Amino acid sequence: METESEQNSNSTNGSSSSGGSSRPQIAQMSLYERQAVQALQALQRQPNAAQYFHQFMLQQQLSNAQLHSLAAVQQATIAASRQASSPNTSTTQQQTTTTQASINLATTSAAQLISRSQSVSSPSATTLTQSVLLGNTTSPPLNQSQAQMYLRPQLGNLLQVNRTLGRNVPLASQLILMPNGAVAAVQQEVPSAQSPGVHADADQVQNLAVRNQQASAQGPQMQGSTQKAIPPGASPVSSLSQASSQALAVAQASSGATNQSLNLSQAGGGSGNSIPGSMGPGGGGQAHGGLGQLPSSGMGGGSCPRKGTGVVQPLPAAQTVTVSQGSQTEAESAAAKKAEADGSGQQNVGMNLTRTATPAPSQTLISSATYTQIQPHSLIQQQQQIHLQQKQVVIQQQIAIHHQQQFQHRQSQLLHTATHLQLAQQQQQQQQQQQQQQQPQATTLTAPQPPQVPPTQQVPPSQSQQQAQTLVVQPMLQSSPLSLPPDAAPKPPIPIQSKPPVAPIKPPQLGAAKMSAAQQPPPHIPVQVVGTRQPGTAQAQALGLAQLAAAVPTSRGMPGTVQSGQAHLASSPPSSQAPGALQECPPTLAPGMTLAPVQGTAHVVKGGATTSSPVVAQVPAAFYMQSVHLPGKPQTLAVKRKADSEEERDDVSTLGSMLPAKASPVAESPKVMDEKSSLGEKAESVANVNANTPSSELVALTPAPSVPPPTLAMVSRQMGDSKPPQAIVKPQILTHIIEGFVIQEGAEPFPVGCSQLLKESEKPLQTGLPTGLTENQSGGPLGVDSPSAELDKKANLLKCEYCGKYAPAEQFRGSKRFCSMTCAKRYNVSCSHQFRLKRKKMKEFQEANYARVRRRGPRRSSSDIARAKIQGKCHRGQEDSSRGSDNSSYDEALSPTSPGPLSVRAGHGERDLGNPNTAPPTPELHGINPVFLSSNPSRWSVEEVYEFIASLQGCQEIAEEFRSQEIDGQALLLLKEEHLMSAMNIKLGPALKICAKINVLKET
């Protein structure tokens, strides 16, 4: 963006040096015009869009000669003003802020913008302007017809401006409906220079710069906020009232599922020489301290009103949105300018609230970039401010009437908000400035603060988070003392945040007044931050909470004067307390986290200080948690926070130890506070928790004003620690259901040890009592079974014979012996391996016996062994039937006549046989004479083979074939079914039987 802006400025300087250079720009303008027309035709035309387009055509009625001469003069004046820009900060430099890299579409005229986008050496600027026109087209709009209705007028407007290259007739303020579907109305800004005789240039064309955030480095540059200079003759009061008139808040529509379409339009005007108390009655203006600016000696009596308008747009795809506060970015850039001009060496760093750490791909930002008219020969003249203010108010009211009827209540609420938010900002910034200068040793700031401070007050450290606020902000500000309602909504406990009590918040459409019924009569000053749910990682959430912990200064033993000490700050005007304060933002939370800090601050008077400038401790008064209920993801927030709390606890505890202990006179270490919190307090807190629980939230603490703040903090912490692991939803564990088996993927690839199912079944037994206590009292939806149900479950568990794991009986199929097919197959493989070892030993034993039989004649031992083998075959059918249901695929793949499965089955038979001699021999089952079994078949002759085959049942005719084929003992053992069927023409049935008998001989 910076290089693009430099290219634009350089190309403009080069092309506008002569008056005749506007001719090639016009030739190239037609190309851009054709592109814009194509973009227009891409949208579906509607009658409303045609009428809007026709109106803009009628409003442009300057002749071509006047336009070309005006364009040439304007190019010359722009080049001159750029050459005149120097470190001596003049009003010309502030009028043409194109030298500022942080402001992309700067305060330039429409002719300047068009010439920049159409110069020969800047083709990228054309792309930039097209992106301004088209917006984020990758995300589908919520309402296509509205998107076309608001985009087409804007396209037509820019087309006409391209044709004219100048403008002297007023253009109506425009709306762009983003393709994401939110209507954003941005009010007009003051033109930088005005000729007294020309009234038509008072109205500015509002072109909303719509850009995609492509990198986090572009975050500060996304603000289209511009800087205007008021000549020394202007009065500060009028500029302040003008800024307050600019503070018209903007409501926006979102018809998506998120239910919260809120934005924050913040405008601040400040004068360089006005006192801090010179606020307008509307409170919309800011003193210069509110913007974090040092008064510039080079400015003289000039005053600089500034206005940054950030319109936040909720995305339909549950993306987080950045709150853009242009006044802060503008303050930063203006401070850098003034530092160059003054040379004072003071490093003034404004609060930049527009940095986005990780912008979403479809995240868009709407910023107002107003192209002011630079008049020829009258660059620095008096502005007609009252006229401009009236024009602005009328245009803004027209915007509200035409496009925001259904959001009138939100507009009034935000009008109230934008006024009070600046009061709170000024007060907080003043205190942060004081603490940074006067107590640098006690501060643990996350970012530098502006150093300008009055030396009257001293404030203990407070932290201000300068990260991007990736949440939609709905401020609800009322000057009143704070009540202390606690909340134990299902969020991870933040150990260093011990004193801020928290309370549940209703959804944003309920309004600011509908808080909990048990609260104190004066309501809070909460800024409700409602974030849309987005599947974020646990690391992002841990990072957000670590930043939150860093942003919350804690004093462990907060005295009981929190309620009474807060009223003087929240209700006091800024003129009595501080010139300005900067808003303390909540840190960048993960998209799934919803945090709502109270905008006011609670003050505790230390050490009996009763002077006019008391020593106060700035602490966040309350933090609100609201669980966002999106369709389809009702209750996953609590589980994620619970899962992340263990990771955050270590990081947060280290941050807590770094915080200064002298924040309050009764500060104690976290360990002491933990030891002091007793079981009685815990029980009392549990009773308070469950007394008044809303059903829409999981667990929400209701107010318990009688308990002091340290007790409340420790109670919420103990409640977070004592909550049992809720295993209902496991977002980090992928669960598969394959063929009836529930497979859960864990973090560890292959757990070694006892069964994970057994561990998970034992966990609820161990935590059964606290689970029952908490969940039964709260009546939350996430209940855990009682120990009796767990015992019943365990009674239904079966033990696998192979792996030894306990699993539910539903997982055991067939014979109920193995928990899965894998165990059944592995069991068979292991049994066959063991049987091979046994058979090898048995063969050696048989060889020895056979040698003895040859020498001494037949003995009983060898025949007993053979009978034992045969007896094992009797049980083969039972073994196979029990194994068949578990391992049918394994058995079907193997032939029953091959030696492999027979050896396996023989192994099963031998394993199942307790004593081989107990059962009588049944050789007739197999039809083999024991005489043949007692000898070695490999040494048989042809006649012995013939006798063997003839002894088999039904094979007397076939025996002759064996004799004719001269098959001896060795050939017999090598026979297969194919040999018998092909060579001897034996049918399949007898061939299979003969091969089965041969296999029995092989095994013996």
Swiss-Prot record:
Which residue positions does Phosphothreonine occur at?
922
**FCS-type ZnF:** 791-825
> One MF term from GO for this chain?
chromatin binding
> For bias kind Low complexity, which ranges apply?
1-22, 432-447, 459-482, 566-583
Tree of life domain:
Eukaryota
Binding-site residues for Zn(2+), renumbered to this chain: 800, 803, 819, 823
Residue ranges, compositional bias (Pro residues): 448-458, 483-495
- Briefly state the protein's biological role: Component of a Polycomb group (PcG) multiprotein PRC1-like complex, a complex class required to maintain the transcriptionally repressive state of many genes, including Hox genes, throughout development. PcG PRC1 complex acts via chromatin remodeling and modification of histones; it mediates monoubiquitination of histone H2A 'Lys-119', rendering chromatin heritably changed in its expressibility. Required for proper control of cellular levels of GMNN expression.
Q: How does it assemble?
A: Homodimer. Component of a PRC1-like complex. Interacts with RNF2 and CBX7. Interacts with PHC2, PHC2 and BMI1.
Alphabetical UniProt keywords: Developmental protein, Disease variant, DNA-binding, Isopeptide bond, Metal-binding, Nucleus, Phosphoprotein, Primary microcephaly, Ubl conjugation, Zinc, Zinc-finger
PROSITE patterns, from UniProt? SAM_DOMAIN, ZF_FCS
Per UniProt, residues of the SAM domain are: 940-1004
Cross-link Glycyl lysine isopeptide (Lys-Gly) (interchain with G-Cter in SUMO2) mapped to chain: 763
Q: List the record's Gene Ontology CC terms alphabetically.
A: nuclear body; nucleoplasm; nucleus; PcG protein complex; PRC1 complex; sex chromatin
**Gene3D superfamilies tied to this protein:** 3.30.60.160, Transcription Factor, Ets-1
Query: InterPro entries, per this entry?
Result: PcG_chromatin_remod_factors (IPR050548), SAM (IPR001660), SAM/pointed_sf (IPR013761), Znf_FCS (IPR012313), Znf_FCS_sf (IPR038603)
One GO term under biological process is: cellular response to leukemia inhibitory factor
Q: Which disease is it linked to?
A: Microcephaly 11, primary, autosomal recessive: A form of microcephaly, a disease defined as a head circumference more than 3 standard deviations below the age-related mean. Brain weight is markedly reduced and the cerebral cortex is disproportionately small.
Matching entries from SUPFAM superfamilies are given as: SAM/Pointed domain (SSF47769)
List all Polar residues biased stretches. Answer: 212-228, 319-329, 344-355
Q: Where is the composition biased (Gly residues)?
A: 279-303
Q: Where do transmembrane segments lie in this chain?
A: none
Miscellaneous notes for this chain?
Answer: The hPRC-H complex purification reported by PubMed:12167701 probably presents a mixture of different PRC1-like complexes.
Q: Where is this region: Disordered?
A: 1-24, 212-241, 261-355, 432-512, 556-589, 636-672, 848-928
Stated name of the protein:
Polyhomeotic-like protein 1
Q: Where in the cell is it found?
A: Nucleus
